[in-house]
Regions:
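Compositionally biased terminal segments of proteins
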Residues: 1-167
């Protein structure tokens, strides 16, 4: 998904009054204020209470649900290789949020960044690094984590510290 597609989509989201948070590769690039690699999709965190409005908006813009990962996560695709990975969450007890039946501190959503000229909410840099752990990483994950760690002075997680052979 290119920057123009993302900016156009963000403007449409803003027009319906739904708050979104960006995560994944575009979330990393938003924090850094520049695009650092190509992206196949954009990951949106949307409150469950806003899910219907958000889904209606993307459907009216040509997106169709192509995959359901769980009740809280689905993939939506449109023409021209535009893909949305939609994550639904809800704010819970004071200072927490619930996603996929897990509880997280809500301050993970305190990140701010830019995509193009658009200011966006996103996961914090530290949260991006934390949630890029514990699964088999792709080269793009390695790129994102190392870039965040080097930019913000975070310790590189052990699973990213060793150079992996190219496959």
């Amino acid at each position: 998904m290119n920057e123009k597609d993302v900016v156009d989509l963000l403007k449409k989201v803003e027009s319906i009054g739904v708050n979104v948070w960006i995560t994944g590769g575009w979330g990393v690039d938003a924090i850094l204020g520049r695009q650092t690699r190509p992206h196949s999709d954009i990951d949106f965190f949307v409150q469950k209470k806003d899910a219907s409005a958000f889904i209606e908006m993307i459907k009216s813009n040509g997106y169709c649900r192509t995959k359901v990962e769980s009740d809280d996560q689905s993939v939506w695709c449109a023409a021209h290789d535009r893909t949305i990975d939609l994550h639904l969450f809800e704010f819970a007890e004071e200072g927490t949020l619930r996603f996929e039946n897990e509880t997280y501190p809500s301050d993970i959503l305190n990140g701010k960044g830019t995509i193009g000229e658009v200011m966006v909410r996103c996961l914090t840099a530290e949260a991006q690094v934390i949630y890029h752990q514990g699964y088999e990483q792709k080269e793009k994950d390695r790129h994102d984590v190392l870039l965040l760690c080097n930019t913000f002075g975070f310790l590189i997680p052990e699973e990213y510290a060793c150079e992996r052979p190219k496959q």
